[in-house]
């Protein structure tokens, strides 16, 4: 880089030498003896063409969207809605606020935390899980211990002054009998299926003991009134037999309807083939 003392100075025409002269830096804009601008155009025009060619690769790209909020944000004031997560939003969303989010990806990357801060959260109160009345009574009966921490059978339990729903008032030392087990499934009355087909020339009869569904299957109750696997298998087998009987009944009705349709078609063909008498009204064409 040339020094300031080596820079030649020249005065502008029409001015005195006492005026401040302009310092003209004449540097050789060349690189290894070759000019910097290869073409014969001006440097400014070449710079414009270089900028336009560089920006042509970014055609179609949009800058990242910036959310716009046209209200004054007061982060210290509580929200009007009272929601726990409103204080973390960029602004209050009311009727006068115009909040625009052009790019939905902004909401994904700036999701506000749910609820208040962890220091402001109160301990969650969880209610104690309540058992069924039957299991609760058994738990209270077996809570009394006998000997060195051994559980007492539910049939004979030493308890205090209690009044069960199935017994009288007891005193300490009396034996509490086991609670009676009630059947869990009430008997359901099902309507019996008809044993014949109406409006058919063929009378179809089925056995009453096959179509009768009024009887309920036998159930073997366990300790808590549950059905054993054998009884459940027996119930499924009986239900399958009932479905088979219903299918047989529907198949018989279908055959009866087919025969009835054939009978009506034959009657209609005979009526069309008979010559019409002059006294009778004319029949429509078949």
Curated annotation (Swiss-Prot):
Q: Which keywords does this chain's UniProt record carry?
A: G1/S host cell cycle checkpoint dysregulation by virus, Host-virus interaction, Modulation of host cell cycle by virus, Transferase, Ubl conjugation, Ubl conjugation pathway
Domain of life from the UniProt record: Viruses
What pathway is it annotated to?
Protein modification; protein sumoylation
Q: Point out the coiled-coil segments of this chain.
A: none
Biological processes annotated in GO: bidirectional double-stranded viral DNA replication; protein sumoylation; symbiont-mediated perturbation of host cell cycle G1/S transition checkpoint
Reproduce the UniProt comment on modification after translation. Sumoylated.
Q: Where is the stretch described as Disordered?
A: 1-22, 106-130
Look up keyword Ubl conjugation and say if it applies: yes
InterPro entries, per this entry?
A: KSHV_K8
The EC code for this enzyme is: 2.3.2.-
Indicate the enzyme's highest-level EC class: transferase
Q: Name one GO molecular function term.
A: transferase activity
Quote the subunit structure annotation: Interacts with host HDAC1 and HDAC2, these interactions suppress HDAC activities. Interacts with protein ORF57. Interacts with protein vPK.
Q: What does this protein do?
A: SUMO E3 ligase that plays a role in viral gene regulation and is essential for viral reactivation. Disrupts host G1 cell cycle control thus allowing viral transcription and translation to proceed at the early stages of infection. Catalyzes its own SUMO modification as well as that of its interacting partners such as host TP53 and RB1. Regulates viral gene expression and reactivation and may mediate the SUMOylation of viral promoters in the low methylated 'Lys-9' histone H3 (H3K9me) region which results in a diminution of viral gene expression after reactivation.
According to UniProt, the name of this protein is E3 SUMO-protein ligase K-bZIP
Organism, by scientific name, is Human herpesvirus 8 type P (isolate GK18)
